[in-house]
């Protein structure tokens, strides 16, 4: 079901023309900073991939991809990508990228099973990135170093926005707070995971939650992850499981946390075998991507995605992602947004 968060007395700080210019400037500035921080080369990415190769991402493992038949391939099915986590790792191998360097791309996707609302659209645009690492890099300290570099690019971009539009005051804290999902559960034991995220983000402003996908001490997961890209079972922060996480910011307009990036150190052979066994999905090991990984023809890597529209939405103090990107929305939501001074593109 769709949802709509209704901020009180919302008034956009920018008109439509200023908004479009702001979107352009943010996207250009941030991707250059991201590229230089992580030493990433821009590459061209697919909008769709062949079904049955194990290349498309399953996200939480339940989302259905948009698919269509290809006439010239005997009606073989293609799937519109959800994200490019596995494709990027294959590309690192094909491009023979050295450790310490990587790639990024403008990723466009369709997620038809999304619950539409202020933060969720059918259309997804993000910077998908992947970087080759060594076995010695597969630890929580290295994960935190990479996350802090990404956050540094975010801080610089926020100041650039302030230079363009002085009415938009910087609000990001200079330091990002790290916490494991188990520590977060113990801090707020009576809350649901999303409410924990809101509480910790309201306190610190910017938070990276480590260990997304691993089982916590209550037997539950903070959130789901497909078992074949992020490593969420190897020991990480404070000897707790997980070498991945989510970067979240406190949004003053919506008065809640928003997830800007999901990322992590990717599974090696041992973590892949362990995680697919835990999830009873060992049949995946017969797919092309998984065979490449098991045969040691893919590099060790770290990677993730950074939401472009959400980042712009945060910087420009917008109440709805539809003020940043063009998509399809329920008619009732459009009417309500108009009444709330939220102008959907």
Swiss-Prot record:
- Describe the family membership recorded for this protein in Swiss-Prot or TrEMBL: Belongs to the class-II aminoacyl-tRNA synthetase family. AsnA subfamily.
One GO BP annotation of this record: L-asparagine biosynthetic process
KW ATP-binding (keyword) present? yes
UniProt main location, coarse: cytoplasm
Its EC number is 6.3.1.1
Q: Which reaction is catalysed here? A: L-aspartate + NH4(+) + ATP = L-asparagine + AMP + diphosphate + H(+)
List the protein's name.
Aspartate--ammonia ligase
Q: What is the lineage of its organism?
A: Bacteria, Pseudomonadati, Bacteroidota, Bacteroidia, Bacteroidales
**Which Gene3D superfamilies does the record associate with it?**
Bira Bifunctional Protein, Domain 2
Q: By its UniProt entry, which InterPro entries does this protein fall under? A: aa-tRNA-synth_II, aa-tRNA-synth_II/BPL/LPL, AsnA
| GO molecular function term, any single one | aspartate-ammonia ligase activity
Annotated keywords: Amino-acid biosynthesis, Asparagine biosynthesis, ATP-binding, Cytoplasm, Ligase, Nucleotide-binding
Instruction: Check the record and name the CDD domains matching this protein.
Output: AsnA
Matches recorded under Pfam families: AsnA
Instruction: Look up the record and report any one GO term of the cellular component aspect.
Output: cytosol
Origin species? Bacteroides fragilis (strain ATCC 25285 / DSM 2151 / CCUG 4856 / JCM 11019 / LMG 10263 / NCTC 9343 / Onslow / VPI 2553 / EN-2)
Record's subcellular location: Cytoplasm
């Amino acid at each position: 079901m769709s949802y709509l968060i209704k901020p009180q007395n919302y008034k956009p700080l920018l008109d439509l023309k200023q908004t479009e210019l702001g979107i352009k400037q943010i996207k250009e500035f941030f991707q250059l900073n991201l590229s230089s921080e992580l030493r990433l080369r821009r590459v061209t990415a697919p909008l769709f991939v062949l079904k049955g190769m194990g290349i498309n991402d399953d996200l939480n493992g339940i989302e259905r991809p948009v698919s269509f038949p290809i006439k010239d391939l005997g009606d073989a099915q293609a799937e519109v990508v959800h994200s490019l986590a596995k494709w990027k790792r294959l590309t690192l191998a094909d491009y023979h990228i050295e450790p310490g360097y990587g790639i990024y791309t403008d990723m466009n996707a369709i997620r038809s099973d999304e619950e539409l609302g202020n933060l969720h659209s059918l259309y997804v645009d993000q910077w998908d990135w992947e970087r080759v690492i060594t076995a010695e890099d597969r630890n929580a300290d290295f994960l935190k170093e990479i996350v802090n570099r990404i956050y540094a690019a975010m801080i610089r971009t926020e100041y650039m926005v302030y230079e363009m539009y002085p009415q938009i005051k910087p609000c990001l804290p200079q330091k990002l707070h790290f916490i494991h999902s188990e520590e977060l559960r113990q801090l707020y034991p009576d809350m649901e995971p999303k409410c924990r995220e809101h509480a910790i983000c309201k306190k610190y402003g910017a938070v990276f939650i480590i260990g997304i996908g691993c089982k916590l001490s209550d037997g539950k997961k903070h959130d789901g992850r497909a078992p074949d890209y992020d490593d969420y079972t190897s020991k990480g922060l404070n000897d707790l499981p997980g070498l991945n996480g989510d970067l979240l910011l406190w949004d003053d307009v919506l008065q809640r946390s928003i997830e800007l990036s999901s990322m992590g150190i990717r599974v090696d052979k041992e973590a892949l075998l362990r995680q697919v066994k835990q999830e009873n999905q060992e049949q995946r090991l017969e797919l092309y991507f998984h065979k490449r990984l098991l045969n040691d023809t893919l590099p060790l890597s770290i990677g993730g995605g950074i939401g472009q529209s959400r980042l712009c939405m945060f910087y420009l103090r917008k109440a709805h992602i539809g003020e940043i990107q063009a998509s399809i929305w329920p008619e009732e939501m459009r009417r309500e947004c108009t009444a709330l001074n939220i102008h959907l593109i």
